Each structure stands twice: as structure tokens, then as C-alpha cells.
UniProtKB/Swiss-Prot annotation:
Zn(2+) 1 binds at residues 70, 72, 85, 88. It comes from the Bacteria. Belongs to the RNA polymerase beta' chain family. Its EC number is 2.7.7.6. Mg(2+) binds at residues 460, 462, 464. This is DNA-directed RNA polymerase subunit beta'. CDD domains: RNAP_beta'_C, RNAP_beta'_N. InterPro entries: DNA-dir_RpoC_beta_prime (IPR045867), DNA-dir_RpoC_beta_prime_bact (IPR012754), RNA_pol_asu (IPR000722), RNA_pol_N (IPR006592), RNA_pol_Rpb1_1 (IPR007080), RNA_pol_Rpb1_3 (IPR007066), RNA_pol_Rpb1_3_sf (IPR042102), RNA_pol_Rpb1_4 (IPR007083). SUPFAM superfamilies: beta and beta-prime subunits of DNA dependent RNA-polymerase (SSF64484). The gene is rpoC. One of its GO terms (molecular function) is magnesium ion binding. It comes from Psychromonas ingrahamii (strain DSM 17664 / CCUG 51855 / 37). Its cofactor is Mg(2+); Zn(2+).
């Protein structure tokens, strides 16, 4: 009983804790954990197999081997528990204490802890302000260090070599003290006066000017302060006592054949003990210094190896040449403690088997093999057998079950009814990878899976396996049923669209039955109901695709749930009429009155969910599936070789292309085109030939000519099986059919470049040997890619989950007024993503004003936009909306529901406790395997787009120019003179229809604000040269134009005109290196002219290779080109695509040759140049100048004297997200990352809601750099959690003190995960050693806010159903801490009664 009480008491102790603190262990602490000192390296006696006394497995120290039995066997049984045997000294207790009793080793000489020594930055080095190199020399006995200078002229911490030390000894005698080894470091650390050090450093920080010194001081100050605050003492980084792990955690297992398998730790401990004992003996014998030193060094090395083998020097290896696994290796990596045992555990009550199709199942069911079910539900069956009296004991029940009699199966049926099981398919990439189903018992050994959930599991039936888990407790069953049931997971959390969508054969069947066929049996018949039409079809009186008239009854359900019935006669087909029979009431017939491809089916299911709710949708989906299977069977669609019709025009098209190629080759031979041009042109020719063949083939396949009932020939969609499969979306695509019946087209070489000769054959004709060989590369690459992709995609998901795991919805509304501005996504003349798709399910941040009114509010702020409101927005032609976003949410920890908006998987406002972070990570990571791995070489076909030279508009409307600088030339046309000009076309309702970037020097046909009709060409420019445009009228004057030094004259072969070319400075003779050729504009009197509106002279510096076609003294008008700079034909840049691009964006990597943005607003000028760089000087409005050095090879977009805005592009290139954040702010960087990531997914046809990407961006912006610390404890330049700074500032404001200011910092996902507040979460992610070292030194306390930390300590997570539990715990704790007032008055009677009750309740046993 006592044991039980003790046990219960212990249980309570560990349960209630609010945080986990990590720190350095002091020697006293290690001794207090220990149950005795391990003195001998022996493990167990080889004859008796009993543990040796005082050895590594000693029973005296660590506890008995067998339960309640001492080693010598004097005391056995439970009644002796707690007795310590006087003979062998072993306490009689449970043997499991050997898992938690520790021992210790008293080290004969102190030893430095390798983590604090070698884990960079070295903590010991920082504390002592010495270099790691020096410290190692002291530790490993190469030099002395002065610990007590005394009255000498030596400095404390000065390093002395052996000879120097001897000299000093002669000079000063024993006035000073210098030591080597860990003792020296120990005494130096012990001497540190932290308060004094901190004061000194703070003072120095105020006075120092050098940046490097300040950085170094800040680092050291943070470390010393964290020691000061955390009650860790610096000298504890040196070990004097070494703890010994409990023996059952480093077991010694007997193998058969009398050998033993042992944990590597035992070897490592043995080494330490051996060397320690030898050192003790040597010290007792007063051995020569050099021997003792060597032994001490060896001891240091063996302790290093025990703690972290291989960190310093060569790893110690065991007998089989494999490095021994040290304590650090035990916890880090995929196989370490964190990831193997704490985050991922194996569970009981589970089984796995192959899956097969269950076409007859309902959506909420799965087929479970009887054998498996019996095994999984055994305990329940036993219980039921006893309850029914069929078995008296568990043993008897067991016998019955083993016999597998009839009554057992009946009972199993009863047990299983209404008891859901979880089905999981690895890899579980998103939360739909585990769903709950009700089991149905089946014969056989394979699990049956409902076909509609295959998409969510990404399962197919080619041998996939799935695992079954049984939720045991009633709570678990409830959760499985209400949250995880497959019927509750109809919408995908990634984009809010149905994921339970029929595919493949079902789609084909539905498509086949909803197609119409001209002149089919029974055309133009009239039916009084859909039922009658079905009857006629079953009787064979009418064909399935016949066009007939049917009387349809339709129910319309209004918003207020009122129903109106309408009956009318509709012309439709028999198949669609039959399909209408399975539609739920209230769904409009228009949804199925068309050929049902995959898209249309999805639309119908979506509409059903929004109109009628979840129950009807599930039934409808099931019925669709049954019907689809039935009619797919009836259709008899199959593929035969004649279905792949080769177009007759193919031969002529190929021949024409070959002739063109021949012509190009002849031109190349004659030297008229370069090799590169020939290559590009040939590839263009073949690409377009391929397109034409494909087009001819599709036209041929998709239409049939038939005779209608009137005897006329008409075209109808073909019933060719191959075409039907592709058209319905069941299987295959136009691109694949092209390879079957068109031509295979161009192939790539292994290095990614395209081979000039295409494969003109297709698979139906067959390939010859060469063609086959060329195409093998593609097949091989596909397989290699897939393998790489899976690993990389998994790693991306892991990093995303890790950064976002602690983001949970914690409150209803944070009251934030901020948000992001959302506009439709338009590229060129196409709307890529309409506004409604981007704002659906978001909350409005600022009132939406109806366009064209003076402030009539269309939708007020804080309203959730649903489908109806989005229709309203579209009708009113709103073209931008401010929506709330997680990024601007002001909740301290977590986010609020209003800023997140709709829960995509449920279709209503998100609830509290929803783990939006993990959901976002899964939604982005799950499609990762569909993305490509390769980088694209843009060459050939793609580079044509780069050299466009005009803009042709596709819509009618008004022109609007944004951030445009332009001049009007002599012909009254607009000439653009800035680089970031955008031209948008706006329709009558004020909606943006298209937008285009205009290059510098483009000539516009119309002015800003002019009307334009579609098809007009509005802007022209020369794509091959870059003009320099004048902004004033005047006379040209050349400066620094010296022939042969800075310029050369060239005459054009064709025209005979001469032009001046500027020589590249690198190629000029030395005399010309410093010349800066310029064109200057002067008035007729020779005075300088100024650029209008400024006092900057109108002079244009000319870049290398610029061509000037004017003569000195020529007159120029506004908008003329003074010079032209030839553009390199746009080089084929590799575009990083697919997965690597997404990873780069989330890691916030600065791209190579990033764009240079203006740091301040002002006027630009050039300062003095250095060897490889130019000096840009931007003069601000207040006269301050900002300087920046730019490499000379960078092509600048801006001329001297131009005004630029902060954040404007000075030199082109990919923009760096860090620059965007610094110069333009949070909203633009969020938009940039969101759009760029979406771009990659859009190319693959994957839809992900913007919200998810914003959630990740929000987590990347968690940290800020302190710019001014005000009255706070932060240091300037320190990186701090934004939430902490905000909370601290709130406190400072309340106290009327100065607040701290900070700049947001964008961290990549790996960096941000490692920089989380929670050290447990960071350590379980990556770089375990570094994270734990840092945390221990700082004495960090993990508050257990996130999900990962709680999983690791074995609690419910603070999300989902665990959220309420944590809330309740917090509330209870607050109530406990609240000052108790009334309860103090207790009358003695009740107190006595309570005490008596308590005493009676507890039975103290013997």
C-alpha cells in the first residue's frame, strides 16, 4: 500500500509543470543525482554473470537485477521491500530503478566539457575572451596560462610557452602562478566577477566606435548576462564530476554462444574510468610531470569521446572500425532520441495489409478482413464473451477466440458496429492521409478502400499497403467519428475545393452517359418524367445518347430554406435524364445538362456542398460513383490501334519543315546566319511544325461527320475512345495523344539542351533505332527525377512544418485594422487569377466602397466574404479589396480567427484551436512531389517572347500609365524615360483588364487617359538596342571623345553612314582609361542646359559599346535618341523552376546578381570611381548624401540627374526579398513571396490558397533587429522575437518609459525554425548539439507553447481538442494563483470532519 501511495504521489508530481528548464549541472547536483561512485571499469563477472561491485553495472549503486530480490539472495519477496541487505548492500526494490538511478565518477583532474569548448562560437572562449586556439593549447598541455600575476608585470590570462614559463620562474620565483590544463581554465572561470564584467562592457559599448568591436562586445555581453541571470556559474563548463547513465539505458545483452552485445557507451565509460584510475595512481606516486600531463590529456580526450565522439580529432572506433556512438549521437539525427522515439512512436492495436477496390462500399465504410479485425478487437471480444457468459475467464475466452467458432464472429460483428477505425497510407503528406471509416467485415486478406478517397490518400491499387489503427477510448472514438470520418473531409484544406471527386473510369462512365449523339435510336421522343426515360432505355426503345424532350420537376431552395417547385419540358439526352434521378432535391438540372467531364463533376459537387450541405453531398458523390462505374462498363470504351488516327496532312507538314531547315542550313553555310541563330531558328521551325501536326490530329480525332435525321451531313464530337478519355479528363492528355498519333517532336539531351533533329515518328508508326535511343534519355531522367523529388519534397515539408507548428488560432479577433491589398492577378493581357478567387473566404479589413459612388459602403469591414458577397463584388466591378491577413495580425502568440478567415476544409469561419500553421505547411508541401526538379534552360522556342517589340492590346478601354516619366517628342508621341513604367488598360467600369511593362525608350501612339480599342498596337520599341533619350532641346557637344583612346569610328557596310562607338574601358589604352565620354546639351550660346525642373546639367554619360550616330554640334529635339546601347541578345538564363525555386523563396535566399534598389529617395549622381566599382551618390531632399558602390559591369537603369524613389530599381536583376522588406515594407514582401510561389505551383496546375503561404511568411517575419533599445533590456543590434518586443513595449508605455524600436527581419525557414523561443522544438529539428549548448548556457526555460514540445513531453497538444484542455489548465492555474480572501474562515468542525474523512480514506497497510 505504501508503495502505491508513493507511486501515486510521484505520478502527481511530474504531471503539473509549465515549462522545462535546461541549465549547466553543478558538481553538487551531479552528486545529488548519483546513488554511488563507479570506481571500477568491470561490468559483469564472466563466470557468474553477476554485476561486479563498484563496476559499471553494480547492483549496490544502481539497484537489484531481479524484482524485489537482493543480489546474494538473502532477501526475496515483497515483504522485505526497502530493506538494504547487509551482505551485498543491495536495496530490495523493483528492478526498473536501474533505468533511472544514476552513478558518478569523481575525476582526478578537471575536464573541459567539449560542447562548451568546441561548439561554435566557443562559450568558454567567449567568457574568457580568449581564442579557441589558445584555450586548446592550454587544455591539451602545450602552454601555460597566468592565473595569478601577483606583483609581476605579467597579465592575467597571458599565454606562456614552456621556455617562457621557465624564464619567468627564474625571474620572479613563486610570485606569480601559471598553470596548464583544465585546472587553469577552471580557476580563470572561477575568478570571473560577472557584475563587474557586465558593467565594464556596457560602458565600453557606449564609447566604442568600431563596428567589429561592437559586434564582439554585444556577443560577449549577451553570454555573460545570460550566465548572470540564469544562476549558472561559468566554472560549471568544466567537469569535475562525471555523471554515469543508468545501466538499463546502456544495456549488456547476452547473445547465444556466450558472447555479449553491449552499448558503445559502456566502452566509452570504461575508457574514462581506466584512465581516471591510472591518473589517480600516478598522482599518488608523484610521477614525473610529463607522464601525469599525458595521462590528463588522455583523460580529457576520453571524456570528450564519451560526450561527443568525433567532435575533436579522430573519432574513437570500436573493434569493427566503426566510430562509437556517444551520448550526443544518441539524441541527434533521424535515428536519435528526438525524432525516433519522442516525435514518432510505434502504436499498438494496429495492422497493415494490401488494399483493393471496394466499389460497393459507402463513402464512410472500409472493408476489413475478418482475421485482422478479430486480432485488432481481441480485448473487446474477450470482454463481450465474458459479459454474455460464454466464457468464465479471460483464459477461456482466449481459447474460444483461438478456435474461431461461429459465436466469435457474431460477437465480432457486434463489437465492430459503430466503432470507427483509422486508415493511414504512408507517406502521410497532409492531414487527409489518415481518415476514419466504419469497418465492414469481409473475407480475404486485403483491406477494401472506397475509390473516392484514393485521391486524398494518393493511393492506387498496384500493391499499395495501408495501416489500420483502432481508437480505443470513447473520446478517441468520438474524435475519429466527428472530425476524421471520411464523410467530414470532403473539401481539401489546401484550396477549399472538393477532394472527393470521381476520377478515371467513373468520369468516363458519366461522360459517356451525358454525351449527345445525332440520329440515335429514339431521337425526338417525349417522356413524361426522367423515370419513364430510364424505363424506355432499359427496354431498349431509346439510345442512351438520344436527344429527347423530358418533363422535369425541379425544386429551388431559397436562402431562407423555402422551397419552390417548377415543372417544365427540357430538351436533353436520355443519359442526363437518368443522371438527374440521383441528384439531390434542390440542385439545379443545368449542372448535369452538359457532357460531364471531371471539371463539371467537381463543379456540381461543390455547388451541392454549398447549397445543400455535407450529408447530401456525400450521398450524391456515392451515387455518382456507382452510376459512373455502371455506365463505364456499359460503354465498352477501350483502346485499339485504329483509335489513334494519324492526320493525312502530317507528311506534307513534315516535308515543308524539312525544306525550311534545309534553307537555313544553306544560309549558315554561306555565313549569313551564326551557329546560334541557326540552332534557334531550326528549333522554332520544328516546334511550330509539331504544333501544326498536333492541331491537325486533334481536329481529326475530335470531330466526326454524321448524317442527321433530315439527311444532312453535320459535325459532332467524336466517340473515339482515346479522344473521349482525354476530353473527359479520365486519363491522358492532348500532349500524350500527340505522341501516339502526331509526332514525338523535339527531345532534350541529358544536359538539358534541345537536339536539333526531332523525332518525326509517333508511337503508332513506331520509332527507328536512333529515335528510340534519343528518347531513352527522357525516360531515364523521369525515374531519376522522381527519386530525388520525393526526398527533397519531404525535406521541404519538414522544414515548413517545423517553422509553422506553433501557429494556432488562439482568439476571435485581435482588432487589427491592417491588412493586405488584394488585386486580381494580371499578366500581360490575361487575368491569371480573378479577384473573387483571391478574396473568397477572407475578412474585409477596410470598408469596400462601391465604385462610382461618393462613399457608399458596399461591404463593411470585418465581414467574411462568402460566395454570395463575392458575386456582389464582381457585379459592382470592384477591382481591389483590403483583406485581413495573418501577417498583420496583432495576437501575441498565435493568430486570430478574423485575420485568418474561412477554414477551407469546412467552409465556415475558422474555429479556435485550429492548427493553421501545420495545415499551411502540409498544403504547400504535399503537392511538392508533383513539382519538377529541373532548372529550365530558356533557349529556342521560349526566347522568342523576350524579343517582342510592341504591345497589342486585347481589350477595349482607357490607357493608364503608372509611375511613368515621359517626354512628348516632336511628333507629339509619348516617349517613356523611366524603367518601372507600367501601362494598364481599364474598362468602362474601372476594372483593370491588362497590364504591361514598358521598357525605357518605348514610343506610345496615344497619350495617358486616351481611349483604345482591342487589337490596336499601342507601343513600339527596338528590342535590340537601348536608346538614351534627351529631355531638352539643344545642341550636342561631345566631351572626352578622343579617337583611338575612348572612341572608334565605324562605317556601316550597307548604308555607308559612319557612327561613333565608345570603347569598353577594359580594352582602352592606358591613356584612355580615365576618360569618361559624355554627350552634353548646350543652348546656341554654348551655356549648359538643365533637365527641366532640376538644376542638374543635361549630360549623358555613355556606357561601353554605345553607338552615337549624331555629329558634334548637331541639333536635337526633345524625345530624340542621342545614343544607342546594343543589347546582348537576351542570354539564355537558367530559370530555376519547380521545387528548388519554392525552397529558395522560403529560405529567403538572396539571388545571384540581385537587383540593386535605391536605399533612399533623391537625385542620383556618380562619384569617384575605384578599380572595379562605380560610386553612386543619391542626394536626398534635405541635402544629405547617401553613397553606394556598384560593380561596373552592372548595367544601370538610371542616368545622372534622375530623381528616384526609395525602393526603385537602379540595376535590373531578380529582386532580393530582404531588400523588398527593408525598402518597401512588409506587405510588398508578402505579396512578392506569395506570387512567386504561386507562379511555380500554377505552372503545374496545383491550386493552393494564398493564406497558407502568408502563414509561412508570417513565421519568417517573427524576428526583428533592435534599432533603439529605449528603456528596455534589449541590446541595440540584438535579434529578438517581435512578440517579445511588442509585449515589452506595452509594459514600457504603461510605465511611461521610452519604447524599443526594431526593424523586421526576414529569416529563411531553416534559420527561423532554429531561432524559435522553444529550444526543445529547435533541438528536435536540426543542429541538436548547437541548440542545446546555447540553451543550457542561457539557462533557457521552454514554456511549451508549440505543438512539438508538447508531443515530446507527452501531453495533449494545444490545438484542436487539446486546445480546450490547455485553456482549462491555464484557467485553473490562474484561479489557484489568485489571492484567496474569503476561504480563510473555516470552522473547526468542518476541518476536523475533513481530516477524519481523509484519514479513513487512506489505508496505511502494515
Amino acid at each position: 500500500m505504501k508503495d502505491l501511495l508513493k507511486f501515486l504521489k510521484q505520478q502527481n508530481k511530474t504531471k503539473e509543470f509549465d515549462g522545462i528548464k535546461i541549465g549547466l549541472a553543478s558538481p553538487e547536483m551531479v552528486r545529488s543525482w548519483s546513488f554511488g561512485e563507479v570506481k571500477k571499469p568491470e561490468t559483469i563477472n564472466y563466470r557468474t554473470f553477476k554485476p561486479e561491485r563498484e563496476g559499471l553495472f553494480c547492483a549496490r549503486i544502481f539497484g537489484p537485477i531481479k524484482d524485489y530480490e537482493c543480489l546474494c539472495g538473502k532477501y526475496k519477496r515483497l515483504k522485505h521491500r526497502g530493506v538494504i541487505c547487509e551482505k551485498c548492500g543491495v536495496e530490495v526494490t523493483q528492478s526498473k530503478v536501474r533505468r533511472d538511478r544514476m552513478g558518478h565518477i569523481e575525476l582526478a583532474s578537471p575536464v573541459a566539457h567539449i560542447w562548451f569548448l568546441k561548439s561554435l562560437p566557443s562559450r568558454i572562449g567567449l567568457m574568457l575572451d580568449m581564442t579557441l586556439r589558445d584555450i586548446e593549447r592550454i587544455l591539451y598541455f602545450e602552454s601555460f596560462v597566468v592565473v595569478e600575476p601577483g606583483m609581476t608585470d605579467l597579465e592575467r590570462r597571458q599565454i606562456l610557452l614552456e621556455e617562457e614559463y621557465l624564464d619567468m620562474l627564474e625571474q620572479w620565483g613563486d610570485e606569480f602562478e601559471a598553470v596548464m590544463g583544465a585546472e587553469a581554465i577552471f580557476s580563470l572561470l572561477k575568478q570571473l566577477d560577472l557584475d563587474h564584467e557586465i558593467a565594464e562592457m556596457r560602458e565600453e559599448l557606449g564609447t566604442t566606435n568600431s563596428e567589429t568591436k561592437r559586434k564582439k562586445l554585444t556577443k560577449r555581453l549577451k553570454l555573460v548576462e545570460s550566465f548572470h541571470q540564469s544562476s549558472n556559474k561559468p566554472e560549471w563548463m568544466i567537469l569535475t564530476v562525471l555523471p554515469v547513465l543508468p545501466p538499463d539505458l546502456r544495456p549488456l545483452v547476452p547473445l547465444d554462444g556466450g558472447r555479449f552485445a553491449t552499448s558503445d557507451l559502456n566502452d566509452l565509460y570504461r575508457r574514462v574510468i581506466n584512465r581516471n584510475n591510472r591518473l589517480k595512481r600516478l598522482l599518488d606516486l608523484a610521477a614525473p610531470d610529463i607522464i601525469v600531463r599525458n595521462e590528463k590529456r588522455m583523460l580529457q580526450e576520453s571524456v570528450d569521446a564519451l560526450l561527443d565522439n568525433g567532435r575533436r580529432g579522430r573519432a574513437i572506433t570500436g573493434s569493427n572500425k566503426r566510430p562509437l556512438k556517444s551520448l550526443a549521437d544518441m539524441i541527434k539525427g533521424k535515428q536519435g532520441r528526438f525524432r525516433q522515439n519522442l516525435l514518432g512512436k510505434r502504436v499498438d492495436y494496429s495492422g497493415r495489409s494490401v488494399i483493393t477496390v471496394g466499389p460497393t462500399l459507402r463513402l464512410h465504410q472500409c472493408g476489413l478482413p475478418k482475421k485482422m479485425a478479430l486480432e485488432l478487437f481481441k480485448p473487446f471480444v474477450y470482454g463481450k464473451l465474458e459479459a454474455l457468459g460464454l466464457a468464465t475467464t479471460i483464459k477461456a475466452a482466449k481459447k474460444l477466440v483461438d478456435r474461431e467458432g461461429g459465436e466469435v464472429w457474431d460477437i465480432l460483428e457486434g463489437v465492430i458496429r459503430e466503432h470507427p477505425v483509422l486508415l493511414n497510407r504512408a507517406p502521410t503528406l497532409h492531414r487527409l492521409g489518415i481518415q476514419a471509416f466504419e469497418p465492414v467485415l469481409i473475407e480475404g486478406k486485403a483491406i477494401q478502400l472506397h475509390p473516392l478517397v484514393c485521391a486524398a490518400y494518393n493511393a492506387d491499387f498496384d500493391g499499395d499497403q495501408m495501416a489500420v489503427h483502432v481508437p480505443l477510448t470513447i473520446e478517441a472514438q468520438l474524435e475519429a467519428r466527428t472530425l476524421m470520418m471520411s464523410t467530414n473531409n470532403i473539401l481539401s484544406p489546401a484550396n477549399g475545393e472538393p477532394i472527393i471527386v470521381p476520377s478515371q473510369d467513373v468520369v468516363l462512365g458519366l461522360y459517356y452517359m451525358t454525351r449527345s449523339k445525332i440520329n440515335s435510336l429514339g431521337e425526338d421522343m417525349w417522356f413524361q418524367s426522367a423515370k419513364e426515360a430510364e424505363k424506355a432505355y432499359r427496354a431498349g426503345a431509346v439510345g442512351l445518347q438520344a436527344i429527347v424532350k423530358v418533363r422535369m420537376k425541379q425544386v429551388h431552395i431559397a436562402d431562407d430554406k423555402s422551397r419552390t417547385e417548377t415543372t417544365n419540358i427540357i430538351e436533353t439526352t436520355v443519359g442526363r435524364a437518368i443522371l438527374s434521378l440521383i441528384m439531390p432535391e434542390g440542385l439545379p438540372f443545368e449542372l448535369v445538362d452538359l457532357p460531364m467531364g471531371k471539371k463539371q463533376i467537381s463543379t456540381a459537387l461543390n455547388a451541392c456542398y454549398r447549397l445543400l450541405g455535407i450529408k447530401h453531398t456525400v450521398i450524391f458523390a456515392d451515387q455518382l460513383m456507382y452510376t459512373g462505374f455502371e455506365y463505364a462498363t456499359l460503354s465498352g470504351a477501350s483502346v485499339c490501334i485504329d483509335d489513334m488516327v494519324i492526320p493525312t496532312t502530317k507528311k506534307t507538314l513534315v516535308e515543308a519543315a524539312e525544306a525550311e531547315v534545309q534553307e537555313i542550313h544553306e544560309q549558315f553555310q554561306a555565313g549569313l546566319v551564326t551557329a546560334g541563330e541557326r540552332y534557334n531558328k531550326v528549333i522554332d521551325i520544328w516546334a511550330s511544325a509539331n504544333e501544326q501536326v498536333a492541331k491537325a490530329m486533334m481536329e481529326n480525332l475530335s470531330k466526326d461527320t454524321v448524317v442527321n435525321s433530315k439527311g444532312e451531313e453535320v459535325q459532332q464530337d467524336s466517340f473515339n475512345s482515346v479522344y473521349m478519355m482525354a476530353d473527359s479528363g479520365a486519363r491522358g492528355s492532348a500532349a500524350q495523344i500527340r505522341q501516339l498519333a502526331g509526332m514525338r517532336g523535339l527531345m532534350a539531351k541529358p544536359d538539358g539542351s534541345i537536339i536539333e533533329t526531332p523525332i518525326t515518328a509517333n508511337f503508332r508508326e513506331g520509332l527507328n533505332v536512333l529515335q528510340y535511343f534519343i528518347s531513352t534519355h527522357g525516360a531515364r531522367k523521369g525515374l531519376a527525377d522522381t527519386a530525388l523529388k520525393t526526398a527533397n519534397s519531404g525535406y521541404l515539408t519538414r522544414r515548413l512544418v517545423d517553422i509553422a507548428q506553433d501557429l494556432v488560432i488562439t482568439e476571435k479577433d485581435c482588432g487589427s485594422e491592417d491588412g493586405l491589398l488584394v488585386t486580381p492577378l494580371i499578366q500581360g493581357g490575361d487575368v491569371v487569377e480573378a479577384l473573387r478567387e483571391r478574396v473568397l473566404g477572407r475578412v474585409v479589413a477596410q470598408d469596400i466602397i462601391k465604385p462610382g459612388t461618393k462613399g457608399e459602403v458596399l461591404i463593411a469591414r470585418n465581414v467574411l466574404l462568402d460566395e454570395k458577397l463575392c458575386d456582389l463584388i464582381e457585379e459592382a466591378s470592384v477591382d481591389q479589396v483590403w483583406v485581413r491577413s495573418v501577417i498583420t495580425c496583432q495576437t501575441d502568440f498565435g493568430a486570430c480567427a478574423q485575420c485568418y478567415g474561412r477554414d477551407l476544409a469546412r467552409g465556415h469561419m475558422v474555429g479556435q484551436g485550429e492548427a493553421i500553421g501545420v495545415m499551411a505547411a502540409q498544403s504547400i508541401g504535399e503537392p511538392g512531389t508533383q513539382l519538377t526538379m529541373r532548372t529550365f534552360h530558356i533557349g529556342g522556342a521560349a526566347s522568342r517572347a523576350a524579343s517582342e517589340n510592341n504591345i497589342q492590346v486585347k481589350n477595349t478601354g482607357k490607357i493608364k500609365l503608372h509611375n511613368a516619366k515621359f517626354v512628348i517628342n516632336s511628333e507629339q508621341k509619348v516617349v517613356v524615360t523611366s524603367r518601372s513604367t507600367e501601362l494598364t488598360i481599364i474598362d468602362k467600369l474601372g476594372r483593370t483588364k491588362e497590364n504591361h511593362r514598358l521598357p525605357y525608350g518605348a514610343v506610345l501612339e496615344k497619350q495617358d487617359g486616351a481611349e483604345i480599342t482591342s487589337g490596336e498596337i499601342i507601343a513600339n520599341w527596338d528590342p535590340h538596342t537601348h536608346p538614351i533619350i534627351t529631355e531638352v532641346e539643344g545642341t550636342v557637344q561631345f566631351l572626352d571623345f578622343i579617337e583611338g583612346l575612348s572612341i572608334t569610328k565605324q562605317a556601316d557596310e550597307f548604308t555607308g553612314l559612319s557612327s561613333t562607338v565608345i570603347i569598353d574601358p577594359a580594352q582602352r589604352p592606358n591613356a584612355g582609361k580615365e576618360l569618361r565620354p559624355m554627350v552634353k546639351l548646350v543652348d546656341p550660346q554654348g551655356n549648359d542646359l538643365f533637365i527641366p525642373g532640376t538644376d542638374v546639367a543635361a549630360q549623358y554619360a555613355l556606357a561601353a559599346n554605345a553607338i552615337v550616330s549624331l555629329e558634334d554640334g548637331a541639333k536635337v529635339r526633345v524625345g530624340d535618341a542621342v545614343a544607342r546601347i546594343p543589347q546582348e541578345s537576351s542570354k539564355t538564363r537558367d530559370i530555376t523552376g519547380g521545387l528548388p525555386r519554392v525552397a529558395d523563396l522560403f529560405e529567403a535566399r538572396t539571388p545571384k546578381d540581385a537587383a540593386i534598389l535605391a536605399e533612399v529617395s533623391g537625385t542620383l549622381a556618380f562619384g569617384k570611381e575605384t578599380k572595379g566599382k562605380r560610386r553612386l551618390v543619391i542626394t536626398q531632399a534635405n541635402g544629405e548624401a547617401y553613397e553606394e558602390m556598384v560593380p561596373k559591369w552592372r548595367h544601370l537603369n538610371i542616368f545622372e540627374g534622375e530623381k528616384i524613389e526609395k525602393g526603385e530599381v537602379i540595376s535590373d536583376g531578380p529582386e532580393s526579398p530582404h531588400d523588398i522588406l527593408r525598402l518597401r515594407g512588409i506587405s510588398p514582401v508578402a505579396n512578392y513571396i506569395t506570387n512567386e510561389v504561386q507562379e511555380v505551383y500554377r505552372l503545374q496546375g496545383v491550386k493552393i490558397n494564398d493564406k497558407h503561404i502568408e502563414v509561412i511568411v508570417n513565421q519568417m517575419l517573427r524576428k526583428g533587429t533592435i534599432t533603439d533599445n529605449g528603456d528596455s533590456a534589449f541590446l541595440v543590434g540584438e535579434q529578438a522575437e517581435v512578440a517579445r518586443v511588442v509585449i515589452e513595449n506595452r509594459r514600457l508605455v504603461a510605465e511611461g518609459k521610452a519604447i524599443a524600436t526594431f526593424d523586421y527581419q526576414l529569416l529563411g525557414i531553416t534559420k527561423a525554425s532554429l531561432a524559435t523561443e522553444s529550444f526543445i522544438s529547435a533541438a528536435s529539428f536540426q543542429e541538436t548539439t548547437r541548440v542545446l549548448t546555447e540553451a543550457a548556457v542561457a539557462g533557457k526555460c521552454d514554456q511549451l507553447h508549440g505543438l512539438k514540445e508538447n508531443v515530446i513531453v507527452g501531453r495533449l497538444i494545444p490545438a484542436g481538442t487539446g486546445f480546450a484542455h490547455h485553456r482549462a489548465r491555464a484557467a485553473a492555474k490562474a484561479a489557484e494563483l489568485a489571492p484567496k480572501v474569503e476561504e480563510t474562515i473555516v470552522d473547526t468542525g468542518t476541518a476536523e470532519q475533513n481530516l477524519a474523512d481523509l484519514l479513513n480514506a487512506v489505508d496505511f497497510g502494515d
